[in-house]
Amino acid sequence: MKYNRNIKGNELRKIDGKFESRYMHDAEVVLEELNKVSPSFCLAKWFNVSIHIPTGKTHSCYHPKSHLIPKTELEDDNSALHNTKHKKEQRGMMLNGIRPPECEFCWQTEDSGSQLSDRAYRSKDVYEPGLIEEAKQLGMDGNARPRYVEVNFNQACNFKCSYCSPH
């Protein structure tokens, strides 16, 4: 796979004789690798986490609703901040080529055939060589160490998230 981790942002590069978005190109390359595992595989379920402190909820992507981090799971293993049973079930579905219903936004985007879904972009954001293999080895039961961590300390939206604001 031709991938350059040192390229940041959305640079225009000459690719195959024409100028294209390097970010989009790299996301397409990562998507090809994801699809070798399954057509529903997404690295975000393993390696992205948003933790909402005031509500005790978590999610790996901003499209699905966040879900409660069960206190009993957290008492047994503090990695349940990210590795909840719910997320592990979703990972199992993805490994088996089943589309988790909570990821409907991406499935609708992909089914439209008009553009890449956030499955490609969120996976590309954390991608590094060997990460797909690591996720496969962890399977649905392993405890993944996130590469992207977002902690929300209050519920107020100030439109300053990276996906709402360029600042």
Provide a role label for each language-model segment:
Residues D111-R147, F159:
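Recognition helices and adjacent regulatory flanks at domain boundaries
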Residues I7-G9, Q155:
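Low-complexity, compositionally biased segments
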Residues Y3-R5, L12, G17-K124:
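Accessory C-terminal segments flanking Radical SAM cores
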Residues L43, Q90, M140, Y148-V151:
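A general structural-boundary detector
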Residues S60-L68, F105, E110, N143-H167:
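Canonical Radical SAM [4Fe-4S] cluster-binding loop centered on the CxxxCxxC motif
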Residues M24-H25, K36, A135-L138, C161:
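Short charge-dense sequence patches
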